[in-house]
């Protein structure tokens, strides 16, 4: 989920990395502008909220989309751009002025056209294959551009939500924004081709390639993480009485690979002193499973380096 948020936001120009986001979540200081990390964090919250709403049997409607937009724009640069409200003004895509635009979405007074997309997403008048539905809904949302800002990220967020809602995925494990970012120019060209020439076929082929490549990469990463857990559990066996606590902490690091002592207390129930001793041991030269990021004696933050390296792999 965090990886999708980071990549989708990078498509829009933010500089936050996955490590920056996780450091921010531990109240550390990321190495990029705070607004960038706040925007990515808001995206994570919006995607989490969307999955929660779908699990609560909410349909994907105007109401939910507005709620998710508000959640995604609640802090950072977007806070002044009408969070959760459809735009009242004309916008354009590309260029500094409307006469330089690559594409001009419908006027604000025609946003009722969104109703047709809402019906399509909810299989009215007839159902559509989930992958095709996600692909077409993304383009249509981007074309309508219903908000003043944040349309790109929210349009990409629609894809995993539709796949979860249709039971193709149990959780938003497909990070299509990784593929879209790597092939950003083609991504934009395929969207534009649909708007100008109605070339849906090329867009669908591109989208299917994205799904296939992303799924393959996700399986590869999952296999590497499974192997990593096995290898590192074995490394803990010689730790004697510390092994059980270290094993609990390792499990927690698979959930939060950048973490502080307080978070580990919350995740494991172990005493702070015990956690401190284990983290000190895991950072020693014969193991080096974690590294301390702050250089401070208090409020230390630790990174599970190998896990992060695997998660950061690109295509």
Q: For the regions a protein language model found, what residue spans apply to each?
A:
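FIC/Doc superfamily catalytic core
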Residues: 1-315
